[in-house]
């Protein structure tokens, strides 16, 4: 029975042998001939006469057991502090990843990174407090209850959060009535303004837009200047004019000036009748 315990797990101790196709090592197999693979491996595994094989003190292939990883208690896990590598010392041109920076617009690099890191740290601390086990929370609460409060402790003043008004609703004299450079939204009446910085242009456009849509604008409308015309309707064109003249194709028998004058003076319906 002691010899049978040394066989490889999975082999029959009564009749151990390998099946054809086994690619592992079988000792002394290369020196055995004249029998089938199963018979030869069976004799070698049981041990030839006068040779104790396999040795009693060890097995051919001991079972392999993966090492157990040490269990680390949840409370002793190290706190993740990867975001501390990002600080205010970053300069414009930094191409690394800054968490939550892709959701902030219309600010310079320093302001975007500072606000993104602040939001990420606040969110990370909030998630970490929610993941604490109830026992740890209970111990933390009891420790807080046991700590005596110092006398005369001043309460921290609460900062009132003032919502920033929209530039559309601001007064025209408000210096904040503009959009910052980098704003990609639509700004009414800013299409035909140029020659100044983006904040100045958006301020002028917002003022013009507010004047057009103010309640008193309908009573005192501003007349737009007449649109320029490509062709004069009361004069003809000079000879050698190489541009297109609508209706000239069907005119003949007069000079170029008379023909173009007649063609340009006709209405669209009259030109269709001539065609």
UniProtKB/Swiss-Prot annotation:
Cytoplasm in keyword set: yes
Keywords: Cell projection, Cilium, Cytoplasm, Cytoskeleton, Flagellum
A matching Pfam family: CMI2B-like
Source organism superkingdom: Eukaryota
Ranges annotated as biased composition (Basic and acidic residues): 71-84, 125-147
Disordered: annotated segments: 62-84, 125-169
Tissues/organs with expression: Expressed in airway epithelial cells.
GO CC terms: axonemal microtubule; motile cilium
Primary location recorded for the protein, binned into one broad class: cytoplasm
Subcellular localization, as worded in the UniProt entry: Cytoplasm, Cytoskeleton, Cilium axoneme; Cytoplasm, Cytoskeleton, Flagellum axoneme
InterPro entries in the cross-refs: CMI2A-C-like_dom (IPR018902)
Subunit structure: Microtubule inner protein component of sperm flagellar doublet microtubules.
PANTHER family, per database record: CAT EYE SYNDROME CRITICAL REGION PROTEIN 6, PROTEIN FAM166B
Family: Belongs to the CIMIP2 family.
Role description: Microtubule inner protein (MIP) part of the dynein-decorated doublet microtubules (DMTs) in cilia axoneme, which is required for motile cilia beating.
Protein name per its UniProtKB record: Ciliary microtubule inner protein 2B
């Amino acid at each position: 029975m002691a010899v049978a315990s040394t066989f490889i797990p999975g082999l029959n101790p009564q009749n151990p042998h390998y099946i054809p196709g086994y690619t592992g090592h079988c000792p002394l197999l290369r020196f055995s001939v004249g029998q089938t693979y199963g018979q030869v491996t069976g004799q070698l595994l049981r041990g030839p006469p006068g040779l104790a094989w396999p040795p009693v003190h060890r097995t051919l292939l001991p079972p392999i057991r993966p090492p157990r990883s040490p269990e680390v208690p949840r409370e002793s896990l190290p706190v993740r502090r990867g975001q501390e590598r990002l600080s205010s010392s970053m300069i414009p041109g930094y191409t690394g990843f800054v968490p939550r920076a892709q959701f902030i617009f219309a600010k310079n690099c320093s302001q975007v990174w500072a606000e993104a890191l602040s939001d990420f740290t606040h969110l990370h601390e909030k998630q970490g407090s929610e993941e604490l086990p109830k026992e740890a929370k209970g111990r933390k609460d009891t420790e807080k209850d046991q700590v005596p409060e110092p006398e005369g402790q001043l309460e921290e003043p609460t900062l009132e959060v003032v919502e920033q008004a929209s530039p559309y609703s601001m007064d025209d004299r408000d210096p904040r009535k503009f959009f910052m450079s980098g704003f990609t939204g639509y700004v009414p009446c800013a299409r035909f303004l140029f020659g100044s910085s983006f904040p100045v242009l958006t301020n002028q456009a917002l003022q013009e837009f507010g004047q057009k849509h103010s309640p008193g604008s309908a009573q005192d409308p501003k007349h737009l200047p007449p649109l320029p015309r490509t062709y004069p309707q009361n004069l003809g064109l000079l000879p050698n004019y190489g541009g297109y003249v609508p209706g000239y194709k069907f005119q003949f028998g007069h000079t170029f000036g008379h023909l173009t004058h007649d063609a340009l003076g006709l209405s669209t319906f009259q030109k269709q009748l001539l065609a």
